[in-house]
Amino acid sequence: MQFFTDSNMQFPLVELSLNQGETVFIQRGSMVYHTPNVTLSTKLNASGSGLGRFVKAVGRSMVSGESSFITQVISQSNNGYIALAPDSPGQVIPLYLGEKQYRLNDGAFLALDGTAYYTMELESVGKALFGGQGGFFVMTTQGQGTLLANAYGSIKKIELNNQEVTIDNAHVVAWSQTLDYNIHLENGFWQSIGTGEGVVNTFRGTGEIYVQSLNLQTFAGLLNRYLPKRS
């Protein structure tokens, strides 16, 4: 899978170029346009088979908020093209999977190729109890290939070398699996209410963290001020 973005667009689409037989999985609803030699089909977003697979996909969707389905894209010949739009305006980056593997927060997945795949990792209740981002699951990558991750706003890469950093959880996009992490409230419940900082991620070790410049929860709260109130 080769991918391109148009630098002239403020919020660019991502165009994928596919060879014959090449398969890509994309976020459901992200397709904007494609060439006639590209076909799309819906797959259950879970491993296994039969009814058990369906129940697993639906159950995971109910708990994590992730869709029960994922879209499979196959090019029937060379020079197949498909354009994708993330569900939030912002930067899209590639994560190359193989020697490096990552975890992703909710809403960061856009596309995946090769033999790469992801699973949803169940967090402890203590980690996720107050989490508005990440839910009870985080995406955990495996295999070889390229994963496209999208953000709300711009993405900054932070590299740790046997160090520690605490980041607002709503700004976290992805991080290396080599890092230890702990999702918790900043300075306890009442201090978090007072400072407005809320849920944070503390990372320790050596690896990469990708953070987004904007906070979707904060923007939603801003919009809510201007929405008509129900009587």
Regions found by a protein language model. Give the residues of each.
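Phosphate/adenylate-binding glycine loop and adjacent helical scaffold
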Residues: 1-231
